[in-house]
From Swiss-Prot:
Protein's name in the database: 3-isopropylmalate dehydratase small subunit
The keyword Electron transport belongs to this UniProt entry's keyword annotation: no
KW Lyase (keyword) present: yes
PANTHER family assigned to the protein according to its UniProt record, in alphabetical order: 3-ISOPROPYLMALATE DEHYDRATASE SMALL SUBUNIT, 3-ISOPROPYLMALATE DEHYDRATASE SMALL SUBUNIT 2-RELATED-RELATED
Class of this enzyme: lyase
Stored HAMAP family: LeuD_type1
Biological source species: Corynebacterium kroppenstedtii (strain DSM 44385 / JCM 11950 / CIP 105744 / CCUG 35717)
Enzyme Commission (EC) number: 4.2.1.33
Role, per record: Catalyzes the isomerization between 2-isopropylmalate and 3-isopropylmalate, via the formation of 2-isopropylmaleate.
Gene: leuD
Length: 195
């Protein structure tokens, strides 16, 4: 997983609340056996509408999604985080995330930055004033900067640390490789190996 310290990219205003994982990536797109190639399924039903925000040239290279509250609700689909990342998003900002989406995002390198609804409304206003505007998300400082405006966001300390270190579950486990190896050496040879 790639380290995330800060990212500057085009902000995409998604003025929708209660965006569940089936809206993020419909079930028909979940048939792949790999973790990549899900970008075509991202918001597939909504992208049928030519006026949908991701169909606008201004936002085609967007990498920071600014969504309404209750993002990522519904069933547990790690594919939702994969689809967002495959499309090019590095950050999703919302007032509330489903716990399971927040966990899946962090484990896959996608920042789920939680802010107040009032701050999100202000960011949407700034993005409307200048479509295609860039924003900066600084994970170290826990800030989002749009022009001269700076907003704070919440993210739990452990997820923040993992993202800044670039540690997925496997890399996190391998930090204990010496202890695991010592444990394996202490086990009877007839017992199965754990790694």
């Amino acid at each position: 997983m790639e380290q995330f310290i800060s990212h500057t990219g085009v902000g995409v205003p998604l003025r929708r609340s209660n965006v569940d994982t089936d809206q993020i990536i419909p079930a028909v797109y979940l048939k792949r056996v790999t973790r990549t190639g899900f970008e075509d399924g991202l918001f597939a039903r909504w992208r049928e509408d030519p006026d949908f925000v991701l169909n606008q040239d201004t936002y085609k290279n967007g990498s920071i999604l600014v969504a309404g509250p209750d993002f990522g609700t519904g069933s547990s689909r790690e594919h939702a985080a994969w689809a967002l990342m495959d499309y090019g998003f590095r950050v999703v900002i919302s007032a509330r995330f489903a716990d399971i989406f927040r966990g899946n995002a962090g484990k896959n390198g996608l920042v789920a930055a939680q802010m107040t609804e009032e701050d999100i409304e202000l960011i949407w206003k700034l993005l409307d004033e200048q479509p295609g505007r860039t924003m900066t998300v600084d994970l170290e400082e826990r800030t989002v900067t749009v022009g001269d405006a700076v907003f704070g966001f919440d993210i739990d300390d452990h997820t923040r640390w993992r993202l800044m270190e670039g540690l997925d579950d496997i890399a996190l486990t391998l930090r204990n490789e010496d202890a695991i190896t010592q444990y394996e050496k202490s086990r009877s040879p007839f017992m199965p190996r754990t790694i």
